[in-house]
Every structure is written in structure tokens, then in C-alpha cells.
Amino acid sequence: MIEQIKSSEIKKFIEKNPNTVLLHVRKEDEWNTVGKPISDSLGIKNFFITISQDSGFIESVKKEINKENQILVMCAAGGRSIIAANLLQNEGYNTYNVSDGFSGNGQDLGWKNYGLPTN
């Protein structure tokens, strides 16, 4: 089962888990129109790898991210990221779903609206 993390909890999570990375799985056109998170100022690396059918998602992640990392997986509102987090957990990765995503999920603010750094 994937642990759910709200954007409001991310800074505290990173403090406790310095080996954390942020994996953003939205499509590139979404990054360009809505914005994208910048996690460098929080002391963690950003990875932008889109999840879609037959996209080679797992292989792309394997090339970029170590299995020793804690991976915060994010999309717009938490739906695609939970799918990605489950796929990666099945491959042996330590994944956590950012449940309110980048833009919020109707209950919680999301990365952007919580005031975390964006581009």
C-alpha cells in the first residue's frame, strides 16, 4: 500500500528523509501551461518523467532514480501519481504519493497553492 503525503507535509518529510527525490509524472504540455514544481530549493532533485500507456515509464525511471531514494510521486491532483507509485513499488522502489498533487485535489491545496516553489 502506498503512503499518502499532502503538500503541507513535504518539508517535514524531506527533513526526516534527506535521500528523497520528487518525480513529477504529468505531461509536458501540462508543465508548460500550468507550471511545474521546483524542488532544488528544498534540497531534493526533480525528475520529470511522463506516465502514459506504453511509454517506457519504468525503464526511464530506472535510468534516472536509485532504488535507495525515497520517491515523492506527483501529478496534477493525485490520480496518475498513485498509479505510477504502485508501478514503481512493484519494481522495488520506495514510493509515496503526493495526494493533493501540483494543483490540489478539491480537499487539499496542492504543491502550487500551498506555496511550494514553482516555475
Predicted regions and their residues:
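Rhodanese-like catalytic fold shared by cysteine-dependent sulfurtransferases
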Residues: 1-20, 28-70, 81-119
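Conserved active-site aspartate in kinases
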Residues: 24
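Short, surface-exposed ligand- or partner-binding patches at beta-edge/loop junctions that are enriched
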Residues: 73-74
